Amino acid sequence: MEIISDKAAMAARSEAVRREGKTIAFVPTMGYLHEGHLSLLKRGRSLCDYLVLSIFVNPTQFGPNEDLDAYPRDEERDRKVAQEAGVDVIFMPNNEMMYGPNYQTYVALEKLPYHLCGLSRPVHFRGVATVVTKLFNIVRPHTAIFGEKDFQQLAVIRQMVKDLDFGIEIIGGPTVREPDGLAMSSRNAYLTPEQRKDAVALYNSLNQAQEMVSAGGKSAAAILEKASETILAVPGAEIDYAKLCDPATLDDVEAIAGPTLMALAVKIGSTRLIDNKVLEP
């Protein structure tokens, strides 16, 4: 396994791999890898000849007063996880490499970012779309794998790849969960032991919503009211959003008429957690 920090060297390596007729799978991350990331890497390993992992805590997707400086980092552990997954190259650029002096070009979508997380994090998806565009141009993968836990991010990237003719296959990897159902996330490291127990309320509310839909429930208001009750029973929990929406457009729905995305963003203490589930009637 090789570690590359220079973007020209990464581009040259990808070009050499392509000249050999090999296919490249790419998993972009911000590091602090967990079993969810490992599942994406294993998927990439199974799909292509060559596997690239990027680790870059992207400053442009964090707004003021968000957790950029506090975001957890553990390079040694990340390297072990990457080795276990069969990664060929870890691309680890720094801020100066990705955003040089007088940097002024950004990628922004018109509609998808202005739902769900974008309502409270207005610059987030501009930063995501920009850094992913740059990484795609450097790594030049045939396939890229993203987690379905970040459903809106996956939707934004799929739309961007389609609109801008990247010619890259985008694959979503299922959410990987702890034994009690909590979605794996690097930010889970912020939780105290008590908050960690309480955080399973997100998963429980999603399951309750599916039970209501399976029993014939169609009212979005009723489903969301029940979810809010479950979450707000947790001391100190604060709901950023709880939404039922069209999985394709992310527009809110008032009634369940087919597969419907339920998406949650909740603060447990100071830690913001997200989760989602596509509810099936």
From Swiss-Prot:
Binding site for beta-alanine: 61
UniProt cross-references to SUPFAM superfamilies, sorted A to Z: Nucleotidylyl transferase (SSF52374)
EC main group: ligase
GO MF term set: ATP binding; pantoate-beta-alanine ligase activity
EC number: 6.3.2.1
One Gene Ontology cellular component annotation held by this UniProt entry: cytosol
Catalytic activity: (R)-pantoate + beta-alanine + ATP = (R)-pantothenate + AMP + diphosphate + H(+)
Similarity comment: Belongs to the pantothenate synthetase family.
Subunit structure: Homodimer.
Official protein name in the record: Pantothenate synthetase
Encoding gene, per UniProt annotation: panC
